[in-house]
Amino acid sequence: GPPWKVGAVKIARHYKWAFTKLFDNFSPDTPAAIVVEDDLLYSPDFLDYFHAVAPLVEIDDTLWAASSWNDNGFDYLVKEPHALYRTGFFPGLGWLMTRELWNELKHKWPQEHWDHWLRQKRQHKGREVLFPAMPRVFHNGVKGTFMDRKTHEKYFARIATNRDEKVKWRVPRAYGGGTDGSIGEIAS
């Protein structure tokens, strides 16, 4: 088949292998994993962000993941480093996979295009993904299975990323979840 088709199959198999090794073989007590790719650059608060939002994914049944990416996080649109949103669309690119979600998905993991598959209602079941207005990763790759310089320049080059080392996150004390949309006190 075409190179992108072969690549899509290899990537889906690789993710399944990695999640199986992590959750089912190596770390039976690990509650979640942050999934990253080799062509991402990270904000100074990347790990702090996930430390703050992981408990939200754990306690809120209307969430199924957290991402550090915002497809609409263009540098001319986003200025607030603490703003968080919810979406029904899986953003990917630096995201949190929980053990609970893996246990739900592992027996039906797709043969290709795992990210598009996760966006299907049968998988997310109406649950949402938490993500920052200002991304915590920057997509740096210009060559890959689904990437070339033209695509990168068109869709990724103008995406902002937090560069402020002073941004701090706290684990939330209060959280409104899906009811009123409030996030509680997680930024300082």
Where is each model-derived feature located?
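Active-site-proximal specificity loops/subdomain of glycosyltransferases
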Residues: 1-31
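Short acidic-glycine motifs
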Residues: 2, 33, 76-82, 87, ...
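A structural signal for well-ordered alpha-helical segments within the folded catalytic domains
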Residues: 13-16, 44, 116-120
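Short beta-strand-to-loop acidic/aromatic patch adjacent to the donor-nucleotide binding site
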Residues: 28-41
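Short, high-confidence coil segments that cap the C-terminus of an alpha-helix
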Residues: 28-30, 60-63, 127
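A structural signal for short, well-ordered beta-strand segments and their strand-loop junctions
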Residues: 35, 65-67, 96, 129-133
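Conserved catalytic core of nucleotide-sugar-dependent glycosyltransferases
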Residues: 43-116
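C-terminal catalytic/acceptor-binding lobe
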Residues: 110-188
